[in-house]
Amino acid sequence: MSEQKLALNEYLKTDSDYLRGTIKEGLDSAVTGSFSDGDQQLIKFHGFYQQDDRDLRNERKEQKLEPLYSFMLRARVPGGICSPQQWLGVDKIASTLTSSNSIRLTTRQTFQYHGIPKRNLKTIIQDLDREALDSIAACGDVNRNVMCNPNPVESKLHEQAYAVAKQLSDHLLPHTRAYAEIWLDEEKLLSTEDETVEPVYGKTYLPRKFKMAVAVPPDNDVDVYTNDLGFIAVAENGELVGFNLTAGGGMGSTHGEVETFPRLADDFGFIKTEDVMKFAEAVMTVQRDWGNRVNRKRSRLKYTIVDHGYEQFKAEVELRAGVKFEPKRDVVIGDRGDRYGWVEGVDGKWHLTLFIESGRIKDLPGQTLQTGLREIAKIHKGDFRMTSNQNMIIAGVAAEDKATIEGLARKHGLLGQVLTQTRGHSIACVALPTCPLAMAEAERYFPEFIDHIDALQAKHGISEQAIVVRMTGCPNGCARPFAAEIGLVGKAPGRYNLYLGASFEGTRLNKMHRENIQEAEILAELDTLFGRYAVERDAGETFGNFTVRVGVVKAVIDAAKDFHG
C-alpha cells in the first residue's frame, strides 16, 4: 500500500501539525466566509463542517457573490446526557449565535447547530467550554460521539453502561493540543522531537470515521450493529459483567459503485468489563494500521474486515488486546424505538420521553419546543438525555414534580400530539438546504411523507404495527436507512431509491426494491404491499420480515455479496 498514492486527506493530516493546519489564519481572515480547501477537512476534527445555503446558491452566483457560507457544529456528548444547566447554555448559543435559531438532535445522541457564521465559531466553542462541553472529535477520522442506551428505567445497569461509554469517549480522544490552542487561546506547549503526541492515533489518525455504541438489551435504540464497534451489555443479577463485542458495521455507500455497501457488524464474542479499553484500543489500532488509506470510499472498518477476513482480524485483535474472546453470551436484542410519555424507574424516579420530530428543536406557531425545554431546564433537578431516535428524555423527575414538568411540556407542544407507532420509530437526516452531500430532501419533507404512510396503514387496518421508516438525502446513511424496514435514500430532487426487508430489531439490512422513483410511485408500491401485509402476515410478523418471507426482496445475509446482488 505504501507504493500507491494515498488519498489526499492522508497528506493533509500528515502535514497539519496534528490538526492545526492554517485554521487560525483562516479564522482571522475577513476576506471570505470560508476556510481553505485543506482546512475544510481539518476543521472536521474540531467538530464542524463548512456548508452553504443551497436554496440561495444560484441567486448569489447571479449576483456575483460567494456562496452564503456557514458552519454546522456538532458537540461531543457521550451517551447523550447533559445537565439542565448545560442545556440552558446550549439553548442560549442557538438563540444568539446561529442564524437557524434552533438546536438539532442527531441520530448519535448529541446536538448540532446550523447556520453559524465563521466569526461566531470561536465564541460558540468557548461558550460550550464554560458549560464543560466541547466539539472535539465530533467529526473527522477519529472515534466519534460514543452512543449509549439512555434507558433510565434500569437505572443501576444504565449507570454502569454509561460509565463505560464515557470512559471510551475520554480514553480515545485525540491528544493534540490544537483545539485548546486555536479555540480556547491556550499557549502552545514546547515539545521534544521524539515526543509521542498521539499514542493511539499516530500522526495520520484513522483512515476514516469510527463509530461506537453501547447497547443495553433488550433495547437496541443505538442500532449497535450499524457501528464500527459495538458493546452489547451482559448483566447477571442486575449487575454489568461484560459485553458481547461487535465490529464492522457502517451505513455509508456510493450510488452506482458496487464495491461500496452498507454492512452490519459481526459478533466476535464476550469480553469482561475490565477488558473493554484493551479491546477498543486493539480494534481501533488494527483499523489504523490495516485500513485502506488509498481509497476513502473503501476505508471504513467494515471493508478492512471483509478484505482481511473475519478470522485474521479476530486473531490480530486478540493479539493486541492480550486477551482472548470468550463465547458470545445469549442476549435478546429488541425494539429500536423510544418509550414515549412517563415511565417509572426502579429507583422510584420518573422519566418523560418527548417526541421531537426529526430532532429539530425550534419555536413554531403552536409548538414552542425550544422555549418549552428552556422552561423545563430552569426547574428540572435531574438530567436531559438525548436519544438516537432524535428525541429528548427529561430524566430523574421526582413524583412530586411530575405535574409541573408535564404542564410545561403540554403548554409548549412537547406533549399531546397524536403519535402513531410508525412515526415514533422513524427518523430522517438534515439533507437540504445545508448538507452539501444531499441529493434530495429529507428532514423538511419527512413529516409529510410519514403522514402518507400513516394514512396507508390506517386504510389497511395496520396502524397498530410499528414500521421502522428512515429517509436520507444521500447514501452516506446518517439516519441509518439501510437498517430500516422501509428505507428511502435520495437519488435526485424528488426521487429516492426504495429499500425493503430489514428486520425490526436492526439485525438484518434491507435491499433495494425500486430505484429512482418519485413520491406517487413510492406510495403506490407501499399501498399494494400494506394491503398484502394486512391479509397475508403471520401472527406477530413484522413488515420487514414479511417482505422477505413472501419474496418481495431477498434477505441480505452477507452484505458484500448480497446487498447489490
Swiss-Prot record:
The answer, when asked if Metal-binding is one of the entry's keywords, is yes
Tell me which Gene3D superfamilies the record gives.
Sulfite Reductase Hemoprotein, domain 1
Q: What does this protein do?
A: Component of the sulfite reductase complex that catalyzes the 6-electron reduction of sulfite to sulfide. This is one of several activities required for the biosynthesis of L-cysteine from sulfate.
Reactions it catalyzes: hydrogen sulfide + 3 NADP(+) + 3 H2O = sulfite + 3 NADPH + 4 H(+)
A GO MF label: sulfite reductase (ferredoxin) activity
User: Which organism does this sequence originate in?
Assistant: Shewanella baltica (strain OS185)
Q: Which UniProt keywords apply?
A: 4Fe-4S, Amino-acid biosynthesis, Cysteine biosynthesis, Heme, Iron, Iron-sulfur, Metal-binding, NADP, Oxidoreductase
Q: What's one GO BP annotation on this UniProt entry?
A: hydrogen sulfide biosynthetic process
State any GO CC term: sulfite reductase complex (NADPH)
Q: Which cofactor does it need?
A: siroheme; [4Fe-4S] cluster
**Record keywords: Metal-binding included?**
yes
UniProt record similarity statement: Belongs to the nitrite and sulfite reductase 4Fe-4S domain family.
EC number of this enzyme: 1.8.1.2
Q: How does it assemble?
A: Alpha(8)-beta(8). The alpha component is a flavoprotein, the beta component is a hemoprotein.
The main enzyme category here is oxidoreductase
The positions annotated for binding siroheme are 478
Q: What is this protein called?
A: Sulfite reductase [NADPH] hemoprotein beta-component
> Which residues are [4Fe-4S] cluster-binding?
429, 435, 474, 478
Provide the cofactor note recorded for this chain's UniProt entry. Binds 1 siroheme per subunit. Binds 1 [4Fe-4S] cluster per subunit.
**What's the domain of life for this entry?**
Bacteria
The pathway is: Sulfur metabolism; hydrogen sulfide biosynthesis; hydrogen sulfide from sulfite (NADPH route): step 1/1
